[in-house]
UniProtKB/Swiss-Prot annotation:
Protein name: Putative redox protein FMP46, mitochondrial
EC number(s) reported in the record: 1.-.-.-
Residues forming the catalytic site: 93
Gene3D superfamilies cross-referenced by the UniProt entry: Glutaredoxin
Subcellular location: Mitochondrion
Function: Putative mitochondrial redox protein which could be involved in the reduction of small toxic molecules.
Record flagged with keyword Transferase: no
Enzyme class, spelled out: oxidoreductase
One GO CC annotation: mitochondrion
Transit peptide, residue positions per record: 1-21
Gene this protein is translated from: FMP46
Entry keyword Kinase: no
Amino acid sequence: MSLLRTLQMQPRVITVFAEHANVGAASEILGALKTASGPKCKVQVSTMFPTLEQLIYMSEINRTAVAAQVPRLSELLQKPSFSEEFSSPLAQCTQDGVWRSQGGLWVDWEKRLLGADGQSVHELLGSSTMTID
């Protein structure tokens, strides 16, 4: 099987960034993803703050949603990629005022879609089924 064929068979990845998967917006997002993402989607839950590269990409997709969840977004986008905030546990980022408690963000990396609640999942992804990791 060729590499291209192998890649075509891989599910699309949707990442949910949340301090706790079963609390607040994250719970709502995961519930919506169960019914709204396609069968070729794989949902990953990350309890770590995005890397600088991920944060830049996410803010290019929907800066308003990212800024609502990441209060110091403009400041963080100016920091070097090795700054301690990047890839730190979200629990620590909440204590440091970098991440809002009870919140969450979901990102469909391939389709360039991003939201902060269950409603955005339904509006942007429609409905079908998927797998959650």
